[in-house]
């Protein structure tokens, strides 16, 4: 029994010694681990701010960017449009701001509604249509005279003989230099405008190359020349010698009125353009639409047959002239748009006689030229 007790005693002591040794070793190992993995105090302080800086520099993918606001004015074709009948439509927007960015509103859609610049007459009356973009806005007075043609013909003659559209307002008294390098070519219609313009200088130093009775056929076939600096000259020579950069044309009314000259209308344009561009290859050419004629009968529906025929032909040839201008790299300015009454004739307030415009008509013409000049300066194009 003594040997057994001694053996047990020895085993107990050995076990206790092993436990103590393990505890000491474990304690030493634990200190060593903390020393190797924990960074020095200075290193830890340096790492944390770097992490914060990176977080601040990261872009916020959810933040919304401000839309770019475009420069330029809103340009409408007219300051006033009066439809003849319910159901008529018209696009009054020119630019320069893209159409899809412009907001449109009608004060009374039951009279005239508007969508993306297109007006629709929906009822009889008068209202206002507004276009806006960013901090810019512009308005147009719009209306409609009648629901049926029968009701339209019952209206006062002065209403039916008034212009369907008025040009945008322009301060003609403000000095203008846009036309200082421009010329305008025409017949007696243009010559009368020259007489009024020379009293006001509303078109600056524009050069007038006008001669009464002339025509496309007369100039192209050398039957009549242009006066330049007091002497007769071929048109292409006058343009070259003047050094102008831009030439407006209002020619063709005498051609439209003559059956034989009508047949040569665009052939004569071909001849004139070829000659002009041969001597002045960089000159800009703008074709102005021909104008309707006036009839002073008491009722518009009783327009004289020859005037009705001419005005119908004018519409046809103006449409072809617009297409011709586009195909031949020329600008096109629709002056007739502003001169017509509700029956497609020259408005009563603009006529001097059946063919020529008075001072009011010429002032409207000058407003149109000035307005479209501003439009071009801001990036618009004539077409």
Regions found by a protein language model. Name each.
Residues 222-225, 254-263, 273, 305-311, ...:
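Second-shell loop/turn segments in exported
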């Amino acid at each position: 029994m003594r040997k057994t007790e001694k053996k047990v005693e020895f085993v107990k002591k050995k076990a206790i010694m092993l436990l103590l040794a393990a505890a000491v070793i474990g304690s030493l190992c634990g200190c060593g681990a903390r020393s190797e993995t924990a960074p020095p105090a200075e290193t830890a302080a340096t790492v944390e701010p770097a992490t914060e800086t990176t977080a601040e520099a990261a872009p916020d993918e959810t933040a919304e960017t401000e839309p770019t606001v475009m420069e330029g004015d809103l340009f409408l074709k007219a300051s006033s449009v009066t439809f003849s009948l319910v159901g008529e439509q018209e696009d009054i927007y020119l630019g320069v701001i893209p159409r899809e960015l412009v907001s449109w509103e009608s004060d009374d859609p039951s009279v005239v509604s508007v969508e993306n610049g297109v007006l629709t007459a929906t009822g009889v009356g008068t209202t206002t249509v507004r276009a806006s973009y960013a901090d810019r806005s512009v308005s147009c007075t719009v209306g409609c005279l009648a629901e049926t043609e029968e009701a339209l013909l019952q209206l006062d003659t002065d209403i039916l003989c008034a212009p369907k559209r008025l040009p945008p307002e322009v301060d003609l008294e403000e000095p203008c230099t846009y036309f200082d390098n421009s010329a305008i070519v025409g017949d007696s219609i243009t010559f009368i405008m020259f007489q009024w313009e020379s009293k006001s200088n509303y078109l600056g130093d524009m050069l007038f190359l006008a001669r009464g009775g002339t025509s496309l056929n007369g100039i192209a076939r050398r039957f009549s020349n242009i006066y330049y600096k007091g002497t007769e000259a071929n048109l292409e020579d006058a343009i070259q010698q003047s050094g102008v950069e831009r030439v407006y044309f209002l020619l063709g009314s005498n051609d439209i009125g003559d059956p034989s000259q009508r047949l040569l209308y665009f052939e004569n344009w071909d001849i004139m353009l070829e000659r002009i561009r041969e001597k002045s290859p960089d000159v800009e050419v703008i074709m102005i639409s021909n104008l309707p004629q006036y009839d002073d009968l008491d009722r518009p529906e009783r327009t004289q047959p020859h005037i009705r025929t001419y005005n119908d032909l004018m519409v046809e040839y103006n449409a072809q002239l617009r297409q011709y201008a586009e195909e031949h790299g020329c600008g096109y300015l629709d002056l007739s748009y502003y001169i017509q009454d509700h029956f497609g004739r020259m408005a009563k307030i603009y006529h001097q006689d059946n063919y020529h415009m008075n001072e009011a008509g010429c002032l409207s013409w000058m407003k149109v030229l000035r307005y479209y000049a501003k439009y071009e300066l801001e990036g618009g194009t004539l077409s």
